[in-house]
Regions:
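Solvent-exposed alpha-helices and their adjacent loops that cap or buttress functional pockets
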Residues: 30-33, 57, 64-65, 72-74, ...
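Short, structural beta-strand-to-alpha-helix junction motif
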Residues: 23, 29, 116, 141-142, ...
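Phosphate/pyrophosphate- and phosphate-bearing ligand-binding catalytic cores of soluble enzymes
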Residues: 20, 26, 71, 170-304, ...
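N-terminal, positively charged, Ser/Thr/Ala/Gly-biased leader segments
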Residues: 1-65
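Glycine-rich beta-strand-to-loop/alpha-helix junction loops that act as flexible
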Residues: 65-70, 113, 287-288
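FAD-binding glycine-rich core of flavoenzymes that anchor FAD
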Residues: 45-50, 54-61, 87-146, 155
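Structural signature of FAD isoalloxazine-binding scaffolds in flavoprotein oxidoreductases
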Residues: 33-34, 38-45, 71-94, 147-182, ...
């Protein structure tokens, strides 16, 4: 990043709102090491749009960070890091649809991309709106949540993208704001078109149902912080059913945990990263872990599983690649 680019950021966003050499540990769930070369907190979707547009239009290398709960950043000292804390949630409209001769009161909820998934779930529950209760146990924000189509499979209704009606994005190539429909995202479990396009989500509109809810509060996060160590959520996605049958996994489970256990029964550790001995599809990170340690562990497990079981595991963690393009 050049001095001229820094001046452009300061004049556009406010010299009092940009920070230099800001430690990432204060802004990421995993307390990552390293410092952002230039740091800006986008408190509203308008802030986010302004920051992203100025970066794109001036070829400033940047990345957008939510809660950092399942994202790993590396080599950020020369990048412009935008911390997205926009969190407006509002009812955007009501309508009634007829399904199987029954009326369903539907509601449209507009949400800023920096809103916490758990906060969105609680808002809906408080308002008597059902459909997103499964988000209670999922960390992170709406932006990365849609980028990765998070949820609790195998039920498709427990995937965030299923409920999306439309969204506001910024085109990564042109810097222009666009309104897109659900079809634009090409959702699959754990996937969306945003992973390819790297477009930036500003806000989303979800179509939900206003009905009484069952008790949703029993769901809890798979993420824990204990004794100075941090446990990630699931690292790899479920394997295919055909592979579970071929390998005769116990109860035909699709979780790769038992397969990883076979190659890591004696413990797998790379510096500050080790495989959990209670859930083998999870990593335990100590305070001195490095992002590259996580990447190396993922590559090691993929290689060993492919060699032993002829399966190509798919990563669920988001190893964010920063780029000005």
């Amino acid at each position: 990043m050049t001095e001229e680019q820094i001046k452009i950021l300061a004049s556009t966003l406010g010299v009092d709102r940009i920070m230099f050499d800001e430690p990432l540990k204060d802004h990421t769930y995993f307390k990552q090491k390293g410092k952002a070369g230039v740091y800006f907190e986008a408190k509203t979707s308008t802030d986010l749009e302004a920051a992203v547009r100025v970066a794109i239009l001036n070829n400033i290398p940047f990345g957008v960070l939510g809660l950092g709960s399942n994202t790993f950043l590396s080599s950020v000292d020369k990048f412009f890091i935008i911390k997205n804390t926009s969190h407006s949630i509002s009812v955007n409209g009501f309508r009634t649809s007829i399904t199987s001769r029954q009326s369903r009161p539907e509601v449209l909820i507009k949400v800023d991309s920096g809103s916490a998934l758990s906060m969105l779930a609680r808002y809906c529950i408080h308002e008597g709106i059902s459909g997103l209760e499964f988000l209670l146990g999922i960390p992170g924000t709406v932006g990365p949540g849609l980028r990765n189509n998070v949820g609790v499979p195998p039920t498709i209704k427990n995937l965030l993208g299923y409920h999306l009606q439309m969204a506001e994005i910024i085109d990564r190539k042109t810097g222009q704001k666009k309104l897109v429909s659900q079809a634009f995202f090409e959702f699959e479990y754990g996937k969306s078109f945003l992973q390819k396009s790297n477009d930036i989500l500003l806000a989303a509109v979800f179509k939900l149902v206003k009905t009484p809810n069952e008790d949703p509060w029993e769901k809890t996060s798979d993420f824990e912080i204990k004794g100075g160590e941090i446990a990630t959520g699931p690292v790899f996605k479920n394997i295919e059913y055909t592979d579970a049958v071929r390998l005769a996994t116990r109860h035909l489970t699709l979780s790769p945990s038992s397969l990883i256990q076979e190659i890591a029964s004696d413990g797998l550790k790379i510096n500050g990263v080790k495989v959990s001995n209670t859930n083998y599809n999870s990593f335990i990170l100590n305070s001195d872990f490095e992002v590259e340690d996580v990447a190396r562990m993922i590559r090691l497990i993929k290689r060993e599983i492919r060699s032993k079981f002829k399966i190509n595991l798919v990563t669920q963690l988001d190893m964010m690649k920063l780029s000005s393009k």
